[in-house]
Amino acid sequence: MRDKIRLVSSAGTGYFYTTTKNKRTMPEKMEIKKFDPKIRQHVIFKEAKIK
């Protein structure tokens, strides 16, 4: 089953992406490097719950 998650910028800008992940094949928290347009840099985005 795929669950919706939110990827929040570690730069503290408040920018986030939403995506899905398969909890069965990837039980650990997701960390991925993506572009943050507020600071115009690639930074690490960490998984958080969708509120």
From Swiss-Prot:
It comes from the Bacteria. InterPro entries: Ribosomal_bL33, Ribosomal_bL33_CS, Ribosomal_bL33_sf, Ribosomal_zn-bd. PROSITE patterns: RIBOSOMAL_L33. One of its GO terms (molecular function) is structural constituent of ribosome. It holds the Pfam family Ribosomal_L33. Signal peptide: none annotated. The keyword Glycoprotein does not apply. Belongs to the bacterial ribosomal protein bL33 family. This is Large ribosomal subunit protein bL33.
